[in-house]
Amino acid sequence: MDKAFDEIIGNSHTDSSSNHKVTRYRRRDLRNELGPRLGFAPSDAASRSKDRLYREREEPPLPKRIRISKIPLDVSDYTLDDMIKEFGSPIFSKIFDNKEDRTCIYEFEDPEVLEKIVERYNGHELHNAKIEVEIYQPQRKHSRMNAHNRRKQTAQEHGRGRPGSHYRQKPNRVSKKNKGREKNNTPTSVEALDAELDAYMKG
């Protein structure tokens, strides 16, 4: 009978062990390496940053443009158009008005025209003022945003202190009431307790 009872207990234990599933977790580094092999993009911020830089390198640079600055405010748009027309029709043009002067930007299909405009009008006097003409390389919008985010992140890191350091915490201020309570709650000496006990027994 004891043998049969042991067999019953053994069978029930075997059944419960077979029904109980043990979840085995793989190491985190192995799980992270499994994602790219299955076709999933890595979620690491550094990897995403590398992918973004790779895409920016693959994109062709924008065409160079000409910038004419320090133009007097009384110079009309028609005057500026007449100055540029002798070099051909620009495929892009934009004029900005500031408080002190004006700035215009032009883009031409032929990049060799830009050098000619610089030679012709850089330092040219227009309405008693010398204008400045230069060739510049425009940047894409996401490149400017990335540069702005990097500057912002750097400023935040400087505000937090040195790398690896903890945030500076302000010391906890204890009110005067709490200070008084702390003084009153100080442990009584052994002699004072004995004196109180003697007085209680005599009373």
Swiss-Prot record:
Q: Where is the composition biased (Basic and acidic residues)?
A: 47-60
Q: Which UniProt keywords apply?
A: Acetylation, DNA-binding, mRNA transport, Nucleus, RNA-binding, Transport
Superkingdom per UniProt: Eukaryota
Query: GO biological process: what's one of them?
Result: poly(A)+ mRNA export from nucleus
Question: Could you give a GO molecular-function term held by this entry?
Answer: RNA binding
Further remarks about this protein from its record: Present with 1310 molecules/cell in log phase SD medium.
Q: How does it assemble?
A: Associates with mRNPs. Interacts with YRA1.
Q: What is this protein called?
A: RNA annealing protein YRA2
Which species is this record about?
Answer: Saccharomyces cerevisiae (strain ATCC 204508 / S288c)
Q: What is the lineage of its organism?
A: Eukaryota, Fungi, Dikarya, Ascomycota, Saccharomycotina
